[in-house]
């Protein structure tokens, strides 16, 4: 069984609607209840900032600081992490009218937020993700890349470096600057990064599909079949170096077409995640709203189990309004699955009774307009 990581103290300053708030926890699950708009999701967003990226809302830093705050926001967490007891601090400060993120680990400044993954992995499911299967391919790519990032912390850096190189190429092409050697250098970089991204996605999906096949519980949460489409689909099993050569040559041959289009038309940024309901053999987007929600929960739980298997440590789960659309049986099954994972889960809802079956497996916290009480 995976070892547990858990937060035992959380402190927020000038974060969203929290002027100053502190919460002491004991390692059990955490249920946050309160009226809509009281700050439940804001607190979970703060926890999500203990991982690389822009948090569960993908927020701009300047929007996160409390209105009227003198400077930026700060988040402090003490936790039992993957490397033992650790104190994490992150927040923002304004430099030249621009909000910049800062990070400290055990009081020492750290340059890269990727170092957070040495101490914990954080996964989340929010109501904003309910339209994942019917929404845009860019939303599914973002979802997929967060799944990859949880087991391959370098994936985010590769993705940002690829985007940077692609923007440089697009700029040269849009300006009509067809400098062969310059473009060739950029395209070589894009090929190496793009294929590495694609292979990391495929490997994560292979591992996840194998786990779903082994662990699926169709009576509770339906099984999902996963497939990638839109980039190098026809080259499965080809060596990475050959894939890089193929993509690099394709980029070189499509300069005129890409210049006319004003963007790069082929690459990992064009991939799409295709999901099918296994038991019904139906595309996820054609399933009912309830079936889509159950599919998504099943995917998140399977991925959490994969992270625990790959790292040896259970991730922290953030499940926003998770119980609202589940019947009593599925709620109980969900809570049991979370227990089996062995980690700490934060859950929100307006009615504490929805979580009654958790009993003493959870701490119940009341949230009232940015104020917390146990």
From Swiss-Prot:
Subcellular location: Cytoplasm
One annotated GO biological process: DNA synthesis involved in DNA repair
Disulfides per UniProt: none
Keyword DNA-binding annotated: yes
CDD domains: ABC_RecF
Residues that, per the record, bind ATP: 34-41
GO molecular function: ATP binding; ATP hydrolysis activity; single-stranded DNA binding
Any one of the GO CC terms: cytoplasm
Domain of life per record: Bacteria
Function: The RecF protein is involved in DNA metabolism; it is required for DNA replication and normal SOS inducibility. RecF binds preferentially to single-stranded, linear DNA. It also seems to bind ATP.
Family per similarity comment: Belongs to the RecF family.
Name of the protein: DNA replication and repair protein RecF
